């Protein structure tokens, strides 16, 4: 082998051993999203892959918002990583409990079937631990490539989430910073760097929507029926605050965000009295508060090109 080629090979091996991964520069990453997607012409079949921040209720709420014809399946776990969903020998915590419902479908089977118009992926949080220990960019790439190998026109999305309310860095601060430094700067920039995923992975920016809504909410005097961010999250059975899992009101915001991105439609005016997955009535926001939720969703989605939605002029 030529000495120069040998040196290059040795350098690549050394970088690989040090954890180096090819990464797109910010400008090149942004260029992937310069042309928006065309709006879907029919109801969608959506596959959700993730964990308890997807949960059973949110996709069912999305189905009600989208109306007749929309359908979904999912594979979930407790704090599940993209790696654990991909690798057959890596256990998925809470698999039996989270998937004990009629909408469960094996993830590989679903993606390989070509029957889904959209595949929505999300990663474990703490996101920096997922990146450090579970190779998030690699598995985002593998799932996107798998989906488009079996159906090239599949729309693949990354559902951006949030962190613990009591995060030491600050909840809003983490949501603000993590979009660029982790969701984009690690998962997208590295996961898409090889150019073999059949197109970009678009973003469902639920964390950004939650943050903007919380800022609107916590400006005095709040909104009808809500006064603080904690009221979007569930309470534990003993009455203490769950700092990461959403209640019905939080799930409604996230379902609206999915709707706006997937269907590229303004969610203002959509129903706000919905059912949970078990058929019971979900807790509903006040009508005026629901309107603000819907407006915030559309503001965020149409000012963030990585959603694939046409942006505001």
Predicted regions and their residues:
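Alpha-helical cap/lid subdomain in secreted, periplasmic
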Residues: 104-248
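Sec-dependent signal peptide recognition
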Residues: 5-12
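Soluble non-cytosolic domains of exported or imported proteins
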Residues: 40, 52-56, 133-138, 173-177, ...
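C-terminal motif of bacterial Sec signal peptides marking the signal peptidase cleavage site
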Residues: 16-17
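Conserved SGNH/GDSL esterase-like catalytic core that processes O-acyl groups on lipids
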Residues: 44-45, 56-139, 143
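N-terminal module-boundary/linker segments of secreted carbohydrate-active enzymes
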Residues: 23-65
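Conserved catalytic region of serine esterases and O-acyltransferases that act on ester linkages
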Residues: 20, 227-313
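Structured segments of extracytoplasmic/periplasmic soluble domains
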Residues: 52, 56, 61-69, 122, ...
């Amino acid at each position: 082998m030529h000495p120069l080629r040998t040196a290059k090979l040795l350098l690549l091996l050394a970088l690989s051993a040090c954890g180096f991964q090819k990464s797109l520069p910010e400008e090149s990453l942004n260029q992937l999203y310069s042309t928006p997607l065309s709006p879907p012409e029919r109801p969608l079949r959506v596959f959700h892959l993730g964990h308890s921040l997807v949960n059973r209720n949110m996709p069912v709420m999305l189905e009600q918002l989208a109306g007749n014809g929309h359908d979904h399946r999912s594979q979930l776990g407790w704090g599940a990583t993209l790696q654990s969903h991909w690798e057959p020998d890596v256990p998925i915590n809470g698999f039996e409990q989270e998937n004990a419902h009629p909408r469960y479908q094996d993830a590989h089977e679903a993606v390989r079937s070509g029957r889904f118009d959209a595949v929505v992926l999300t990663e474990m949080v703490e996101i920096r631990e997922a990146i450090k220990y579970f190779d998030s960019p690699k598995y985002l790439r593998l799932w996107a490539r798998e989906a488009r190998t079996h159906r090239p026109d599949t729309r693949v999305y990354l559902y951006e989430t949030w962190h613990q309310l009591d995060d030491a860095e600050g909840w809003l601060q983490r949501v603000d910073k993590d979009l660029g430094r982790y969701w984009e700067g690690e998962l997208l920039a590295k996961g898409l760097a090889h150019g073999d995923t059949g197109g970009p992975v678009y973003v469902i920016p639920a964390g950004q929507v939650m943050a903007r809504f919380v800022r609107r909410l916590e400006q005095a005097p709040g909104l009808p029926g809500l006064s603080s961010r904690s009221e979007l999250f569930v309470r534990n059975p003993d009455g203490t605050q769950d700092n990461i899992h959403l209640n019905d009101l939080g799930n409604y915001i996230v379902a609206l965000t999915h709707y706006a991105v997937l269907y590229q439609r303004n969610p203002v005016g959509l129903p706000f009295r919905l059912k949970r997955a078990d058929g019971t009535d979900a807790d509903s926001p006040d009508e005026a508060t629901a309107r603000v939720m819907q407006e915030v969703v559309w503001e965020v989605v149409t000012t963030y090109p990585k959603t694939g939605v046409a942006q505001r002029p």
